[in-house]
């Protein structure tokens, strides 16, 4: 019997509905971790004042370009910029790793007939989190690089690497082995992956647009709300990808 996207969508949403509390807990936890870690790297009020003064001085000088801006900064200001940038990436990656590891472990356990909580899911995935962090970091850098070149390469890489976290979690594969298998399976089942990835990207863009219009919400609260809903959207995609992989992965494919 052929696999249809409608069947997978229905199955994924039913799972999401039945495990809503656990999934929501994981989404909130990941968003809070990202926010709290982000605050550790955000410059304090005095440092922000120095950065603002540097930006104002640069803007009034009539120059343009990020390289010129950085070159005009003091070493202390450059260090703050670098720290904030690295901190933002690191905190976002940690939140993503907790979400991906927790959701995929939850789906695997429930599919096997075991009842576990969201915290138990994170605990069970702990041994995989370092490898998962490396995998997500590499995939994110590749996809962002593709998006910077042109939009299409980034989308293609998003589709090609979409199954790699599922493969790593389900099959205990290494980073590059998971990416290799994902690449082959993704293009062999592209009709089932493209709509899901495009819906995911569209939903995230719409969410950013909506949250950005809610000006009455404090910026920090808006950031947390955006993070939670982004995580819920990603959780639905992860459930879909796990279900899809379980259907398309034959013993021959698993031995690749």
UniProtKB/Swiss-Prot annotation:
Keyword Zinc listed: no
Subcellular location: Cell inner membrane
Official protein name in the record: UPF0259 membrane protein plu2479
Disulfide bond residue pairs: none
Main location group: membrane
Bilayer topology term: Multi-pass membrane protein
Signal peptide from the UniProt entry: none
Family listed: Belongs to the UPF0259 family.
Database matches in HAMAP family: UPF0259 (MF_01067)
Domain of life from the UniProt record: Bacteria
């Amino acid at each position: 019997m052929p696999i249809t996207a409608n069947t997978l969508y229905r199955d994924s949403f039913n799972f999401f509905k039945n495990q809503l509390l656990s999934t929501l807990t994981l989404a909130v936890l990941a968003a809070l971790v990202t926010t709290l870690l982000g605050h550790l790297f955000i410059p304090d009020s005095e440092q922000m004042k120095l950065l603002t003064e540097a930006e104002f001085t640069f803007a009034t000088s009539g120059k343009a370009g990020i390289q010129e801006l950085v070159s005009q900064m003091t070493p202390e200001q450059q260090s703050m910029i670098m720290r904030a940038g690295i901190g933002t990436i690191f905190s976002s990656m940690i939140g993503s790793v907790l979400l991906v590891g927790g959701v995929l472990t939850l789906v695997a356990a429930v599919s096997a007939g075991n009842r576990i909580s969201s915290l138990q899911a994170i605990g069970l995935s702990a041994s995989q989190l370092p490898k998962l962090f490396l995998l997500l970091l590499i995939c994110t850098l590749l996809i962002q690089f593709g998006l910077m070149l042109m939009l299409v390469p980034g989308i293609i890489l998003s589709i090609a690497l979409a199954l790699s976290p599922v493969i790593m979690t389900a099959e205990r594969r290494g980073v590059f082995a998971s990416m290799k298998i994902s690449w082959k399976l993704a293009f062999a089942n592209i009709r089932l992956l493209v709509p899901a990835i495009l819906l995911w990207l569209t939903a995230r863009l719409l969410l950013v647009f909506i949250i950005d219009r809610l000006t009455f919400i404090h910026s920090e609260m808006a950031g947390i709300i955006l993070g939670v809903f982004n995580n819920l959207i990603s959780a639905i995609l992860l459930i879909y990808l796990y279900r899809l992989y379980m259907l398309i992965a034959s013993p021959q494919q698993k031995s690749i």
